[in-house]
Amino acid sequence: MNPVRKTFQYGNSTVTLETGRIARQATGAVLVTMDDTVVLVTAVAEKEAVPGRDFFPLSVHYQEKTYAAGRIPGGYFKREGRPSEKETLTSRLIDRPIRPLFPDGFMNEVQIICTVMSANKDVDPDIASIIGAAAALEISGVPFQGPLAAARVGYTDEDGYLLNPGFKAIENSKLDMVVAGTEDAVLMVESEAKELTEDQMLGAVLFAHQEMQVAVQAIKEFAQEAGKPKWDWQAPEVNAELLEALKAKFAGSIGEAYGIRVKADRYAKLGELRQQAEEELAGEEEGKFEAELVKKYFSKLEKACVRQNIIKGEPRIDGRDTKTVRDLKIEVGVLPNTHGSALFTRGETQALVTATLGTMRDVLMVDALEGEKKDSFMFHYNFPPYSVGEASRVGGVGRREIGHGRLARRGVQALMPNLEEFPYAVRCVSEITESNGSSSMASVCGSSLALMDAGIPVKAPVAGIAMGLVKEGDSFAVLTDILGDEDHLGDMDFKVAGTEKGVTALQMDIKINGITDEIMEIALEQALHARLHILGEMNKVISEPRDSVADNAPKMETIKIDPDKIRDVIGKGGATIRSICEDTGASIDIDDNGTVRIYAESKLAADEAIYRITEITAEAEVGKLYRGKVERIVEFGAFVNILPGKDGLVHISQIAQERVENVTDYLKEGQEVVVKVLDIDARGRIKLSMKEVTEDEKASMAG
């Protein structure tokens, strides 16, 4: 073994890349260490592509092992199960900047596995994983146009931009952004922010790109020392004869088809033309071409036609110019029994979004490497096949749905009230009922509307918009509110969510090199105008949260009790609190600091539960009257229960005005009496009196 190591300083972190010691049979393997977080990243690539394959089979698997944090997994089998949401999102985060750096026509299967083997609880392993994946590919010899690196950026008013902040620093930051890029260009941005300006967001991207050059250079030097010989791979030759034949016969017809505004009709016409091209140009005789090749080149021609029209300044596929948002239709309160609902339609993209309130028992428990966390805000995104007019498998949640749900959640997260202001668990669900471009941003708009419809005190309305780019040479066009086809045929997917004040989420994926600062600035500016337009239309329907939550939402009351009394409220084995919940129908949550939250279907039920709790936790007060029950009679008096678990002594001399010879002549066990507290001694013993209670006081207690 001849291990090769490269160590470099990356902000406040020390990063070490190592290869040649572990996983030596992989095409490329790098062990990345970043402040005691250790990630093993392997890249394995097929030497030959499967004949006839027409897609690039890249798969990225990020996995966290519980032993990395010194823990044994839960569950019956005590081993890691299916990928968590964090693992799925990080897999996508690694995939997105890597995918565009493989050359066109490379169809060999590539699999990247990132395994977190040691975890520093303040360091997110995602940056180390992206750096490791880039380094593993760079030394593997696989055709790859790297190296690339990644950086996390935070922002505070006091310190400005922060490079690779840890979890603790992010808690106090107004920004959590991950940027990946090469020496020359930014390829991917993923972020959430607390209403930062467009200039601040762009500044963060440029700051990250500048700072990551240290890592890019380190990977380059590492590959020079440890890299394998580059593969002798040649891109497939362009079949100029087929391309010219397709242009001559179908370019005009394709252009006309893309003038059809309705997506289904447009797809039907393009399908007819594709079929016609196969019939005319595919076959085994001389001068004909393979059917799959005809389909492939027909798609290339489609892309070229649409892109040229946009660059020339001609109307887009649906007739809009580059800055116009599609027609909007906005409704709230569309579902009668949900706590909040909205139907947001933008052109042929539609999201039906609901907001549901729950108790603190409904919060999501997240078992992460850095420790267990409670998540009181959940956002789930569903993309059924009917939304694009298809009939296909309906099954579990896919990576795409998890990713889109997290992006939409980021858009509204910063505007959600904290638990002190609004102690409810909240779940938003976005059902995509139609899709033709940027359903995730429709989900942001719909969720903002649904949350306000539910009476949840969000700080401001939020809207989202997707931008696109077509770039040919030095000419480019930035597109507002892209269609699905424009996303597929374009060079950039740029999604921005925010309020009137600033940006709350920014996601960017770039498929080409050469995206300039100017292009990003124009995209952010156009997105701002589009966002303000959408917010204006949303505000016409609902501009602030409703005054109260829905009638069928849980009613919540909060009281404080002495923390020492918590055990009394819970009771032996939970018997007392269970009895209160069963009798009143309420749900009760108690924090360690004595905060008690009561959730009930009606205020009457909540008040009854509060009364029961205050009875249990109440302390006797000197001079106060109580209605009590005689529990036990002794020679010198009687013990009377005045509060749950609280008995006091009525001395024989305090039973009546006259002299009492026998207590049993005046009192019986189980008898209800009105008493006054005379004194409470240092040991908590309560002295009671019956004779000090006046007739008027007795009457008031009876009423």
Swiss-Prot record:
Component of the RNA degradosome, which is a multiprotein complex involved in RNA processing and mRNA degradation. It is found in: Cytoplasm. Residues 623-691 form the S1 motif domain. GO terms for molecular function: 3'-5'-RNA exonuclease activity; magnesium ion binding; polyribonucleotide nucleotidyltransferase activity; RNA binding. It catalyses: RNA(n+1) + phosphate = RNA(n) + a ribonucleoside 5'-diphosphate. This is Polyribonucleotide nucleotidyltransferase. Its main location: cytoplasm. One of its GO terms (biological process) is RNA processing. The keyword Manganese does not apply. NCBIfam families: polynuc_phos, PRK11824.1. Coiled coil: none annotated. Its cofactor is Mg(2+). Its EC number is 2.7.7.8. The lineage of its organism: Bacteria, Pseudomonadati, Pseudomonadota, Gammaproteobacteria, Oceanospirillales. PROSITE patterns: KH_TYPE_1, S1. Residues 554-613 form the KH domain. PANTHER family: POLYRIBONUCLEOTIDE NUCLEOTIDYLTRANSFERASE, POLYRIBONUCLEOTIDE NUCLEOTIDYLTRANSFERASE 1, MITOCHONDRIAL. Mg(2+) binds at residues 487, 493. Keywords: Cytoplasm, Magnesium, Metal-binding, Nucleotidyltransferase, RNA-binding, Transferase. SMART domains: KH, S1. Involved in mRNA degradation. Catalyzes the phosphorolysis of single-stranded polyribonucleotides processively in the 3'- to 5'-direction. The keyword Transferase applies. Belongs to the polyribonucleotide nucleotidyltransferase family. One of its GO terms (cellular component) is cytosol. Gene3D superfamilies: GHMP Kinase, N-terminal domain (3.30.230.70), K Homology domain, type 1 (3.30.1370.10), Nucleic acid-binding proteins (2.40.50.140).
